Amino acid sequence: EEILLLTGESRKMSDVEYIGEACKIAKKYFKLIGLEIYPVNSDEYTYLHQCGADYVTVFQETYNTDKYETLHLMGHKRVWPYRFDAQERALRGGMRGVAFSALLGLSDFRKDALASALHVYYLQRK
């Protein structure tokens, strides 16, 4: 009934159109389609939702911005605020649901767990 479509962080290897086509195919066989992909803009989330995606998971990795900067030295993933705002863009793009999490263990797991909960709380209040 449900499937999770997963990509890496490379737009080159799995661009939004490719993911959209995968959603269209999956929609023929599954009731719910989840995505675990790199963060995209609101228009792209709208497109993916129109292709059949229902929800999105984006791992923040860590909410410790100093640690995050040491893990991502270059490229699109380096922009912490863009990743932080991914769930909000997904909801604005029409997704029915979003998921939050840090990769516990990259930094103090207690602080990241609390920050994940506060991230959800923050978005619920917007």
Question: For each predicted feature, which ranges?
Answer:
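Nucleotide-activated chemistry modules centered on ATP-dependent adenylation/adenylyltransferase
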Residues: 110-111
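Charged helix-capping and loop-helix junction motifs
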Residues: 16-21, 114-117
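Oxyanion-binding "anion nests"
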Residues: 98-101, 114-126
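Core AdoMet radical
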Residues: 1-17, 25-90, 96-101, 106
